[in-house]
Amino acid sequence: GRGDVYKRQIRVRAVPGSGKTFALTKRIVYLILELYVEPSSIVAMTFTNKAANEMKYRLKKMIGDFATCYAGTFHGYCNLILKEEIYRLSYPKTFVILDKKAQVDLIREVADELGFSLKDFTAKEYADKICEEKQDRAYIPLMLDTGREALQKKISHTQDPFYQVYYSYLKKQRDNYVLDFEDIIQFAIYILTQYKEALKKWQSRCQYLLCDEYQDVNKNQEYLLYL
């Protein structure tokens, strides 16, 4: 029947501005009003806060108080996961998320403590390189209690100025329970892959998963979608 179409995986391919986001919004409305899907079991991922706010506005306009599904960014959803699950890594749920400026400031602070003097441009370059390093989740164990000794060894043994700053930056993050933008998705994936009960809980909550602008997802965002 018609409802079966809404239960299958569907990819909509069309040129920009042709109404893909509107089609996704209408799909959510149909799931809730016609198939009686619990709104809280629907997750709609977008790439920007602007797109998320637009979707929320449309949903509110179409279905009013039924618009209680999650419609937001990947980072926003992963932040929800971390608020509930980060205790598993011995981090408090009051952890702090750095914006780009605060991250650059922390990098400069770490460099100063190491005796380096980083200019603004160099500190921003280091921030970009740290972002690249964090595309692989192998760094996360270094930011846990069990990785303190291994991290200290890396700080002591590396001669490369960037890696001295990088590993000291990880230590500073861990000591102060601070995450940067890259950590949000990576920590969420790490928890969901290391703790099966956490994965099952979030899978059971998310019965319908929708993603706007799927062609723009990176490998980590795609990995999250398929968990």
At which residue positions do the language-model features occur?
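Residues at helix-coil transition
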Residues: 33, 83, 112, 174, ...
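P-loop NTPase Walker
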Residues: 4-93, 97, 200
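Conserved helicase NTPase motor core
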Residues: 4, 8-16, 23, 43, ...
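Glycine-rich phosphate-binding loop
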Residues: 1
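ATP-hydrolysis module of ASCE/P-loop NTPase motor domains
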Residues: 66-69, 87-183, 206
